[in-house]
Amino acid sequence: MALVATAIGIYDQSATTTITLSRSDVFDGATPKAAIVTAVSGNPHAYNTSSDRLAYGYGAVVSRNGGRAMGCGIVANDGVNSGASREVTSDSNPITIPNTGGTNIEALMSGQLVADGITFTKTGSWRSTSNTVAIHVVLLGGDDFDAWIPSSLITSQSVQKSIPFLPNAATYFGTGSNTGGVAFKDDSGLC
């Protein structure tokens, strides 16, 4: 099984940043690819080991594995106990993730599965211009994707890094003004 986490940090001082994934990035025909897409704002992005959640973020689970949603409980808008994840099984079951008031959220970001793919849009201003937005993608099984989000969709101010997925371990990187951080556990620890 190939498991790779790709994190893309976008350093953008403007009011709006949009990244779109095409439908073919998310689906293989009518079958959702095994992937977890999580949109996170804030810098750095810390892993909250006490609650098995990704702190300071919220996002969308866009696939299933073995009949159950992958990543349940991985998303929290306050890093403690307010999950905002939802299972998405088809284009007719879209998802919108709002900012529900977590104190550590610097900007509002939403992810929605639509007919032509997923669009993430950051709106509003940063608490400080040194903060970043990161899009995290974890692929479970299948091919080993190093850069799942096409680099052509990323601005010249961005940085992109790929790190191995470490089973049963939190992985973290990125503390600078334009770097992203990511932390995941293996799927057995998510639900």
Outline where the language-model segments fall.
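Surface-exposed molecular-recognition determinants
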Residues: 1-191
